[in-house]
């Protein structure tokens, strides 16, 4: 039997370019893994894995459904323990393939940097947002002056908002092992490596591959919001904390190269971080006020700890004695007031001599940081602390003041190069992360605020707020906001829900205001939604009220958003309150689920244009907050392209974007990834402001308006109006079983009963991604384009022109093309054959015909013969992955069949995988099956199913 290694080389015969080592990396990791598999579980299982791979590769070659049946008969003959080992093996091999890709991409980038040569890369020149290249392009091609660039850069802000959306399907224990495999692989191919080093690295590589394979991939309990927050914060520890100053230094260098001899000021807010973990209550009952308080204190403790761990390095560096009189006086004062040794410090524990004034001052900063950390720790553990608040840092200004004093003094004494060393990095960290590491956003559904208001008005006996008209609500809210009297006392009758809203606001009042960012209202529709939150914040005595951000998601809400925001701006009280700044959030996932991708993308585009117009009329600076998912169905896609395809004037130097679940790992999992992410966001935001994309021509708009209606009708006629669609969806995908994956702390439905409306956008997309049919992404496109071309043949050339000249349209089409390249209707047909009742088969066939028709139209408009012909690298990477995914799909479909149909009989062959310990060889299957004793299905089926879900998610790389 040909080894997988040989098969790989057959599958991808030609290198894409000289520096293409992907197949080599992939083959090395697989060889190592298969040897480990054989050592642990015996030769038979290795052969079974190879046989499955071979059948899949044959299927991928000709797409002959018979090959899938052959594959199915191999897979269904495995007993419980064996099918777990096979599922785990394929899932593991896909993870290894992803790692090989990441190392290859990093390698090609490095080569490209060394050659500084041409960019015939998957991210052709338009997408490569290297900050230096962007500066040079702006100066050379667009005639901007270096000063203009510096000025725009200093005043722009990108705020990355980490959300714990339940799409990160890999456990943290595994992510760390993956990181080490990546490092070993990269070092193994370094040029100057000695034979001994090579041998040791190879051993380390095998060790990590085995450790990852021997780790249970399945989360046995759902994570709590605190777990999610700790997982999110671990990226700060590992990459972001050090990555930010490193990135800002690169910006300084790039500025120098275009002739600016200044550094980016440390108080320029280039990059900010926020978080929803522990603040996002929308549909997640597990996020309680208690959780919000814990998460804030934990983040403060982590921030103080990170600063504390660096302050001694700074004390070592600043050993100078020349300083300004002001600093000398401060140092003397501190020196005389503290006369004790500090034995709990490792360095500088003795009394610091007065002739080292910077160290004296930093010593005091260190004491305060120590107290700040300990106070947060005690508050977290016991709810109280014996450290007085005035011995800690409570505001950013307090913390910055002594550091700025040192910086100014060094510069005044001619030691600017020293000031611009570690001290500048430290100042930039302080300015970026503050005392709270990230600012926590609070998100709540608008109905919950309405319930609270209703309880208040009923209690005051002035009627039912719920039944009032919008006008009456506004009038009452404004009269209360202009007045001074408290609205309610402790005698307000409260349900659990109402108490939850009010207790959350009390937490906001109790904790320092720099812990928090925005208060986001989901499903917002009218000005009263915003005013109600303003009033509640005042009633709960939030000293510095959070800015209130309406979130518009559904198609109808997006269309009505500009008018709602205009009404809000026309209220004098509100206009005075916001001080000329407003943030509006637009949701990509729910709009896509509601109307389909094409109409949602166009509605989001138009809503932004109109919102910016409204803000201009009222003299308000608008920040758009983009709630994008990681998948295309939920608005995902390459960062820089997404930003550069936004309508002109909508970015305007300030941008907020959610970074979710698995996207956090792809963007910040490694130092070089973190660096690249920060570059991309900064460069694309700058470029969008200084060189905005073109506005679409009136005839393009008219055409899109017309066909978007057709797309929505087609999408809704199937998803919402087809009477048996929900039944078909639940049968043809693993949607019902998705909840068992324990990915996130949030339930997968808004309301337990009900159809597609109540299903969250994430499981909706996840389920279709599993069967490689991706219905939500493409449904509607074919009908829309077909209608346009049928109506007038000339429309084809109009659409082609739109594709070639208009970034927004091009990005929309390219992303759908990429999803088609990952899709496979033959696999979806297998699920139908096994799982769907026969009278629904014609419906599935109709959808698959739609898939093919839409694919053809997309290729026509893009002017491509084959999918992804403009992107050979991505095409090669997808081809390498397909054969692994196919085995997992077949295994998933047959496992679902066994779970759902008790009468489905399969002929099992004898158990083949051996366990290493011979003493247990009489009950080896039992070992693996025992991991999940509470499963309601036959032994091993649930674990096999979850492993296939995780494997396919790893292969598709855009889970939810």
Curated annotation (Swiss-Prot):
It catalyses: oxaloacetate + phosphate = phosphoenolpyruvate + hydrogencarbonate. It holds the Pfam family PEPcase. It comes from the Eukaryota. The active site is at residues 165, 593. Pathway: Photosynthesis; C3 acid pathway. One of its GO terms (biological process) is leaf development. GO terms for cellular component: apoplast; chloroplast; cytosol. The keyword Ribonucleoprotein does not apply. It is found in: Cytoplasm. GO terms for molecular function: phosphoenolpyruvate carboxylase activity. Its cofactor is Mg(2+). Keywords: Allosteric enzyme, Carbon dioxide fixation, Cytoplasm, Lyase, Magnesium, Photosynthesis. Homotetramer. Belongs to the PEPCase type 1 family. Through the carboxylation of phosphoenolpyruvate (PEP) it forms oxaloacetate, a four-carbon dicarboxylic acid source for the tricarboxylic acid cycle. This is Phosphoenolpyruvate carboxylase 2.
